[in-house]
């Protein structure tokens, strides 16, 4: 197995854990604001990455994808009980299990993009990007006001 892939699989769980968000000392308004800012980052990184997926510039794509993974991992932590509001549907807190599955699928699709980048596989990169984008739409259909 390629040494890059081995390192990738060792580092990804560590990186995901290291992106913990400290929201304990924040007001509901601050958490909602951070959540909305984080969603804006996710949208910006995804929009920036889309044209890059066809460029073959894997180092540049990797940089954006790492930022996207960080933002997505952080985003998952920004929905604690009692922070309902903004554009987030109350259904997030009512059906938390499904919401967490959707977010986990989104994060996994970003990790799959990283594997495509490491393999410099343009075809799987585009496929995984489309899966990631589809995961966004699925979650928004169910959970966005």
Q: What are the roles of these predicted feature ranges?
A:
Residues 4-14:
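Sec-dependent N-terminal signal peptides
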Residues 11, 129-132:
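Residue-level signal for mature regions of secreted extracellular proteins and peptides
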Residues 16-20:
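Boundary at the C-terminal end of the N-terminal hydrophobic targeting segment
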Residues 21-129:
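Extracytoplasmic c-type cytochrome modules immediately beyond a signal peptide or single-pass transmembrane anchor
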Residues 132-144:
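The canonical Cys-X-X-Cys-His
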